[in-house]
Amino acid sequence: MRLNELSPAPGSKKDRKRVGRGDAGRGNYSGRGMKGQKARSGGATRPGFEGGQLPIYLRLPRKRGFFNPFRIEYTVVNIEQLNIFEAGTEVTPETMLAAGLIRNFVKPVKILAAGHIDRALEVSAHKFSQAAKAQIEAAGGKVQEIDYAAEIE
C-alpha cells in the first residue's frame, strides 16, 4: 500500500449538489420555487423577521435585572424541622445530613424561622435569619455561625 493508492471508503463521500445546471433534477428554479423574495439573490429575510408583523421578541416584555454569578445559594432548613433532635443536642450540618434534613454539603446551610422550636439546641450553621436566631435563643438554645469562606479554602 502506498500513499497514492489510498482512497476513501465507498459511499463515504457524497457528490455536492449542483443546482441550476439544466432542466433535470435541480435545474430551472434550483429548489427556490417560483418568484417571491426568497427566490431572488440576497433575498433572505433577517432572523426573527415575521413579514412586517410585530415580531415575538418585540411583543414580549423584556427580562430585567441581571444574574449574579457570584451569589451564594443556601440549603434551607426551617427551625420546626430541628424539633426531631433531643433537647441539648449540638446540631451541625453533619448531624442534619445524618438526620436527612439536608442532602449533601454542596451548598451552605441557612436556618429560617418557619414554625416553632420547643427545645434548647446548640445550632451551628452557615447563616441564620434574625427571627430564627431569636427563636432558638428564646427557647434556651445557642447559635453559632460557621464561616463559609474559610470552609471553601
UniProtKB/Swiss-Prot annotation:
PROSITE patterns, per database record: RIBOSOMAL_L15
Keywords: Ribonucleoprotein, Ribosomal protein, RNA-binding, rRNA-binding
Any one annotated GO CC term: cytosolic large ribosomal subunit
Region of interest (Disordered), ranges: 1-48
Gene Ontology BP, a term: translation
Entry-linked InterPro entries: Ribosomal_uL15 (IPR030878), Ribosomal_uL15/eL18 (IPR021131), Ribosomal_uL15/eL18_sf (IPR036227), Ribosomal_uL15_bac-type (IPR005749), Ribosomal_uL15_CS (IPR001196)
Source domain of life: Bacteria
Name of one Pfam family that matches: Ribosomal_L27A
A GO term for molecular function: rRNA binding
Subunit structure: Part of the 50S ribosomal subunit.
Family (UniProt): Belongs to the universal ribosomal protein uL15 family.
HAMAP family assigned: Ribosomal_uL15
Stated role: Binds to the 23S rRNA.
Entry protein name: Large ribosomal subunit protein uL15
